[in-house]
């Protein structure tokens, strides 16, 4: 809802019956729309009730067969001032050998995040930064002095995690398994263009990091592509334009 308030859309909050565990309804121009913010690939049971369902973490393989499910960019920034400040103050130059992996192991990702951190520490020692930053601004400023950020997704191993999405928005090159996701505007994430892909079991992660050391200009280009993708698809204005374009299509 903060996206709509930022683009100065008047909002009226009303109490409505619950829809699902990870969904809510919104009415725009007298049309009832479903927002599905689940991290998972589940489908709302009463999907046929809605002409449009905007789905976070939309994948072509799981959702394209449903004509009323529309891709939607997942949550990135709650405070958009941090994004605007970050665009001015965060400058990814890839001029350092520090490798970022600032994710706390937990939930569905506890095993793989612990395994990846152990792998990175064994190989790179004190060149790995695994600190957890309580302040978002501190987390973003780590970008200024890193080689690359290794991102291990949370609920699923092939989903776009919020931290990775924020880093992409600010122009940092990231490494993760293949992200089978489509953002608002119907634009897919593309490996080697918007991020560097590694195997799902991270067995080639060290190889990918070593590649970054040898191709720093390419890393900068990937980070820039990611930032441009975010600006095109996932800012409040871009998302609102996408919503309007789908509502007007009948």
What are these regions (language model features)?
Residues 1-191, 233, 237-241, 245:
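Nucleotide-sugar donor-binding catalytic core of glycosyltransferases
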Residues 116, 139-142, 208, 222, ...:
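Alpha-helical packing segments of well-folded alpha/beta enzyme cores
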Residues 161, 192, 202, 206-209, ...:
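Short amphipathic alpha-helical surface patches that serve as generic macromolecular interface elements
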Residues 167, 195, 226:
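Hydrophobic, well-ordered secondary-structure elements that form the walls
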Residues 174, 193-201, 246-250:
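Short, contiguous hydrophobic alpha-helices characteristic of membrane insertion segments
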Residues 196, 201-218:
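C-terminal "capping" alpha-helix adjacent to the active site of nucleotide-linked donor transferases
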């Amino acid at each position: 809802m903060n996206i709509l308030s930022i683009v100065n859309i008047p909002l009226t909050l009303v109490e409505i019956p619950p829809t699902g565990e990870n969904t809510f309804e919104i009415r725009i121009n007298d049309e009832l729309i479903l927002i599905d913010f689940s991290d998972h690939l589940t489908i709302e049971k009463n999907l046929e009730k809605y002409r449009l369902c905007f789905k976070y973490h939309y994948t072509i393989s799981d959702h394209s067969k449903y004509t009323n499910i529309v891709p939607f960019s997942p949550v990135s920034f709650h405070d958009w001032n941090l994004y605007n400040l970050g665009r001015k103050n965060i400058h990814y130059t890839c001029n350092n050998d520090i490798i970022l992996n600032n994710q706390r192991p937990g939930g569905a990702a506890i095993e793989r995040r612990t395994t990846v951190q152990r792998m990175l520490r064994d190989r790179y020692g004190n060149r790995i930064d695994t600190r957890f930053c309580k302040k978002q601004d501190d987390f973003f400023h780590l970008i200024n002095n890193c080689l690359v950020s290794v991102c291990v997704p949370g609920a699923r191993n092939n989903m776009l995690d919020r931290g990775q999405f924020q880093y992409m928005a600010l122009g940092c090159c990231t490494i993760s398994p293949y992200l089978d996701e489509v953002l608002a505007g119907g634009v897919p994430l593309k490996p080697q263009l918007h991020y560097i892909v590694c195997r799902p079991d991270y067995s080639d992660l060290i190889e990918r990091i070593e590649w970054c050391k040898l191709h720093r200009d390419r890393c900068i280009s990937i980070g820039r592509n990611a930032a441009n993708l975010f600006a095109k698809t996932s800012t409040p204005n871009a998302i609102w334009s996408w919503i309007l374009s789908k509502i007007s299509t009948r």
